[in-house]
Amino acid sequence: MSRRKIGVVVVAACAAVLPLVFASVSATSPSQASAIYFGMDAPLTGPTQLVGQSDRQAVDAVVAYWNSRGGIKGRRVVVDVLDNASNPSQAVQNVQKFISDPKYVGIFGSGNAAAAVATGAIASQAGIPFIALSPPTGLVEPPQPYAYILTATARLYAYSEAAYLKSIGVKRVWLMGDNGGYGRDGPAQVSKLAKKYGLEIVDTTIFSPASTDFSAELTRIKNSNAQALWLWTATPAGPTIVKQFKQLQLPQRLVLTGANVSPQFLQGTCGDVNGAIVNSFLATAWTFLPKTDPVRKEAALLRSILKRPVSNFDGDAAGALWAFKAAIEKGAATRAGINDALETKLRGVVTPAGRIFLSRRNHQGLQLDSMWVGRIQNCQVKPLFGKAFAKPKKK
């Protein structure tokens, strides 16, 4: 198997072919010997394949862009990708392969939250920098050595949206999430902050992402006193729930999260999703930022590299890419060097997703200032609430 010029190799998660693939990747030539290697564990198939495929496309495009301009510090970048099929057990096998090969200086952790949790601890113990492309709060609270989340965690999504719901008078919510990592983490985080924001949780529904009919669950919600349905899922069940929410004419407000901010979701639910409340980070609403905002410049660059609208998943990947690049430029292209730079030299680094702030005690990059909340109008997001979009007060 030959490696694509841009340095990204997608490998099927099949044990029979892995030795052959990695033998070809490891072949030594002058250009390969000087390359900087990363591993990427991604859900390219399975329930969260939209996440994994979007992550891979963003990594693919950005790495190609960097390599066409000299790579990082004059060295070509190579990202080897393994499919975990949205399965934490397969993710563990993938990450162990990256850990065992000393040429890999860092790992892009899975966009599947459960898989990221299962593998982040292993990478931490092995001493290899691991940046999850998903938002499992427990991975970084408390912080684990070498394990990071540069995108928003489920906790940050919850805090951002709870503040907005309070501001518009929503007090009673029904939580709904899939039985995966993100679908459980989100409702759990809302439960923890509910009292602070004056929220009453009427009930919580956890569902299988393989389900195709939610009419019974939605009818229960419709007949409740809940003012809003807050949905947590990045699976194909999301569009189904949105469509049935509209068909059953629920009177409640529909509340979505960044997991639903992608061209595929917005186009697939166009007409049904209009009016929904949603939140994300700055990469997905960069055109609304002031022209002087440095994040706008980085997000515009990402948009030009991708040649399509920026999704939440693109922002997840971009934050990790920008952080790894900054860490190598400020430190060294070694496992220890990258980790030291992440913990000590990345405060206020501008990425397409927002500014990231890391320290030895904080391994979550984005902060509340990089979040926005708004509505979906004409099948597009429109930010309404967030520090970056606040109009300066008149003196």
Put a short name on every predicted segment.
Residues 28-40, 71-76, 165-171:
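Immediate post-signal peptide segment of exported/extracytoplasmic ligand-binding proteins
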Residues 35-37, 50-57, 69-139, 150, ...:
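Beta-alpha junction/loop-to-helix N-cap segments that form part of ligand/metal-binding clefts
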Residues 36-59, 82-89, 111-114, 178-184, ...:
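Extracytoplasmic "Venus flytrap"
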Residues 93, 137-139, 145-249, 287-297:
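Extracellular/periplasmic Venus flytrap/periplasmic-binding protein
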Residues 98-111, 131-133, 172-177, 225-235, ...:
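Periplasmic-binding protein-like
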Residues 242-318, 375, 380-393:
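Extracellular/periplasmic periplasmic-binding protein-like sensory domains
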Residues 304-314, 325-381:
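Segments of small-molecule ligand-sensing domains
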